[in-house]
């Protein structure tokens, strides 16, 4: 939040672990996907095997495609984060299309991911990677004009990681 003028009254992000016990998690998740400005998938092998992760991707992609049909926005608002090194991942085609490497992140980030950097005690590299990713996320949020959508757009989501 230090990079933005966000007032801190509400959380600037959504992590599906914050859904309260007894809450309608699908509705809450769909609302978050219909209103967030940036989608930040955390790339792990397990991520690409989870049905709802593929459905979340589908929802956000639909939202971007829908807006492109009705009004322009300035670019893709999916910013992937490598949790492990790229050599440990088999990306489904939909994810392989999205650039996850950037020179400012460096080779160490690509080889180890955030988790690998942290576990190896490479705290300076870890912090610089997190800082660079935070700057990218804020920049994308500010530059893309992705508008909220109606959650009806998400009524028949499919796992876009499956069967590709």
Question: Can you describe what each PLM-predicted range is?
Answer:
Residues 1-2, 25, 32, 73-164:
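C-terminal interaction surface of TIR/SEFIR-family domains
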Residues 1-12, 64-76:
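Short mixed-charge
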Residues 1-30, 46-52, 111-117:
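Conserved BB-loop
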Residues 36:
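An anion/phosphate-binding loop that grips the pyrophosphate of nucleotide cofactors and donors
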Residues 45-67:
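Conserved TIR/SEFIR loop-to-helix hotspot centered on a Trp-containing motif
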Residues 44-45, 84:
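Residue-level signal for short, function-critical loop segments
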Residues 30, 52-58, 94-98:
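"Short basic amphipathic alpha-helical interaction patches in structured regions
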């Amino acid at each position: 939040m230090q990079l933005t003028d966000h007032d801190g009254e509400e959380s600037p992000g959504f992590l599906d672990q914050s859904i309260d016990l007894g809450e309608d998690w699908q509705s809450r998740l769909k609302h978050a996907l219909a209103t967030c400005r940036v989608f930040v998938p955390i790339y792990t092998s397990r991520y690409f095997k989870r049905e709802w992760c593929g459905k979340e991707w589908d929802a956000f992609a639909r939202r971007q495609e829908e807006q492109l049909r009705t009004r322009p926005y300035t670019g893709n608002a999916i910013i992937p984060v490598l949790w492990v090194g790229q050599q440990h991942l088999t990306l489904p085609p939909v994810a392989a299309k999205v650039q996850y490497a950037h020179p400012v992140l460096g080779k160490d980030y690509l080889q180890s991911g955030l988790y690998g950097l942290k576990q190896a005690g490479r705290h300076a590299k870890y912090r610089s990677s997190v800082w660079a990713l935070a700057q990218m996320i804020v920049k994308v949020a500010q530059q893309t004009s992705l508008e909220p959508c109606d959650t009806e757009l998400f009524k028949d989501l499919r796992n876009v990681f499956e069967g590709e």
